Design a protein with these regions (language model features):
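Signature of Gram-negative outer-membrane beta-barrel scaffolds
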Residues: 149-236, 246-249
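Extracellular/periplasm-exposed beta-strand and loop segments of Gram-negative cell-envelope proteins
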Residues: 71-79, 107-118, 122-131, 160-169, ...
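Transmembrane beta-barrel wall of Gram-negative outer-membrane proteins
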Residues: 1-23, 32-66, 77-105, 144-150
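Residue-level signature of outer-membrane beta-barrel architecture
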Residues: 6-8, 48, 91, 132, ...
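Extracellular loop and loop/strand-boundary signature of outer-membrane beta-barrel proteins
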Residues: 27-34, 68-76, 84-88, 118-127, ...
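Surface-exposed extracellular loop regions of Gram-negative outer-membrane beta-barrel proteins
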Residues: 10-23, 55, 63-66, 99-123, 165-169, 229, ...
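Hydrophobic, lipid-facing positions within transmembrane beta-strands of outer-membrane proteins
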Residues: 2, 40-44, 60, 81-87, ...
């Protein structure tokens, strides 16, 4: 693992790069071990003050895990990973109003790869499941008095699911098959009132959401409330309640009894 960070320009911007690698994988490869497992991930962040009240930041993360089992004539591999990138603008409009705007992209995938060779007979196949998502969120924090603060904003996302796409080569013949992709569009508006006095804090809010998958549209209203008291020294008690909704897209692989969920 290693981290590199520093300033881009004095008192204006900075950068950070961090990476990790599972080094026993290299040892297993040198020893020609039949079973190998490894992972890596890379994190990067750039931050720059484009104005004394406006800060722009770019964040990127990519990670992957993989496992392989190799025998005399056969090799099986599995892998899963994700990549995400976000661009965020933090703004301070006055002493009582701040805002945050973020746009993001996320890619999730898992895969299975098999290869068999024996006496001129050769089979190879790879099956993948993928999810692409891009979206945006805008949030405002506004102080109305010394005990009352409002948080409000909007969110949007678009997801595309690509279930079970298989590529194979069987004795020189190429074959491709898979299910059609599915899409989900969702949006939300939210408002939260926060009251704070002494050790007491109360939150009362509501969120309205809509989900559309090209076949049907669903609406949801999600009220939420919380009351808490802070005794100090990391001791607090709270009571909360919320009604929450979530879109779930589920694909079942026909040769497994277990489902593969994306949410």
């Amino acid at each position: 693992a290693g981290t590199l960070d520093g300033p881009i320009k004095r008192d204006k911007g900075s950068y950070l790069i961090s990476a990790r690698y599972f080094f026993p994988e290299a040892v297993l490869a040198i020893a020609d071990n039949a079973v190998r497992y490894g992972f890596y991930d890379v994190t990067g962040k750039l931050t720059y003050d484009i104005h004394r009240n406006h800060t722009l930041s770019l964040g990127i993360y990519s990670g992957d895990d993989h496992m392989k089992n190799k025998e005399d004539h056969a090799e099986n591999g599995f892998g899963w990973g994700n990549t995400t990138a976000s661009l965020r603008l933090e703004s301070r409009w006055n002493d009582n109003l701040r805002s945050s705007v973020v746009a993001y992209y996320t890619y999730l995938q898992n895969r299975q790869e098999t290869e068999f060779k024996d006496d001129g007979f050769s089979n190879w196949g790879k099956t993948t499941f993928k999810t692409h998502e891009f979206g945006a969120r805008m949030t405002f924090d506004q102080r109305l008095s010394h005990i009352w603060m409002l948080e409000y904003g909007a969110a949007f996302s678009h997801q595309r699911f690509e279930p079970m796409h298989t590529k194979s080569i069987i004795n020189g013949q190429h074959k491709n098959r898979g299910y059609s992709s599915e899409q989900l569009v969702s949006g939300a508006l939210f408002l939260n009132n926060r009251f704070q006095w002494g050790g007491w804090r109360a939150d009362v809010g509501v969120r309205g959401a809509v989900y559309d998958n090209s076949e049907q549209t669903k609406y949801a209203v999600e009220p939420r409330a919380q009351l808490s008291y802070d005794f100090g020294r990391d001791n607090a008690v709270w009571l909360s309640g919320t009604i929450n909704s979530q879109a779930l897209v589920q694909f079942n692989r026909y040769y497994y009894s277990m489902p593969i969920d994306f949410w």
